[in-house]
A protein has these predicted regions:
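Catalytic core of membrane glycerolipid acyltransferases/transacylases, capturing the structured
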Residues: 3-61
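Surface-exposed loop/turn positions
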Residues: 1-3, 80
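Non-catalytic C-terminal accessory region of glycerolipid acyltransferases
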Residues: 65-196
Length: 196
């Protein structure tokens, strides 16, 4: 049975690795859609579908991204399982909300999920990076990025805590989309992820 996992993005690049490892033990056909950065680790390539971010404005899809999306749809249509990190970037500290939270989900990923027409499994990472990491992000995201390798290594001997939510059926999604916009659909799915 094809399905999509959706998840928050608290740690950075290792989120995709953790999901690929966890679900890869359950389903050998599980792949995760990631930015091209992880593609450089050749041992991971069979578990990845790579897309290229299009920059800060995210104005136009690149050929690599279009091919990645096509590969992902083909993978699902052939019965595969796919992992998505819809925020597309690591969680950060929101001064407005006073907490660490995912960024807004990417409209292209929301549209992809609606088009895929497969069950969706919400997954939530319960932990996050250090307070120091988020404090650096208040200075500048590039300063915070320099800290990311240390954040990966300080979790080396810590268990990763995941919660899996209820599977959201295709019928539930269709019913919701019949009376709501894609943006509302994205918020609805995001709520599932945060409640898990």
């Amino acid at each position: 049975m094809p399905f999509i996992t959706i998840s928050n993005h608290p740690y950075g690049h290792i989120d995709g690795l953790i999901l690929a490892d966890y679900f890869g033990h359950l389903r050998t056909d599980y792949k995760i859609m990631v930015t091209q950065f992880l593609e450089r680790v050749e041992a991971l390539t069979p578990s990845l579908i790579s897309v290229t971010p299009t920059g800060v404005e995210r104005t136009a899809a690149t050929a690599k991204s279009i091919m990645g999306v096509r590969r992902a749809l083909t993978h699902l249509r052939s019965g595969g399982a796919l992992g998505l990190l819809p925020a597309g970037a690591i969680s950060d500290f929101s001064l407005r909300d006073g907490c660490v939270r995912d960024r807004e989900w990417q409209p292209a990923i929301i549209a992809f999920m609606a088009k895929a027409q497969v069950p969706i499994l919400p997954v939530r990472f319960l932990d996050r990076n250090s307070a120091f990491f988020y404090m650096l992000g208040l200075i500048d995201w590039r300063v915070r990025l320099l800290r990311l390798p240390a954040e990966v290594f300080n979790k080396a001997h810590c268990p990763v805590r995941l919660c899996l939510g209820p599977l959201i059926s295709v019928e539930e999604q269709r019913q919701y989309l019949a009376t709501h916009t894609l943006e509302e659909y994205g918020l609805w799915l995001r709520t599932y992820c945060s409640r898990v």
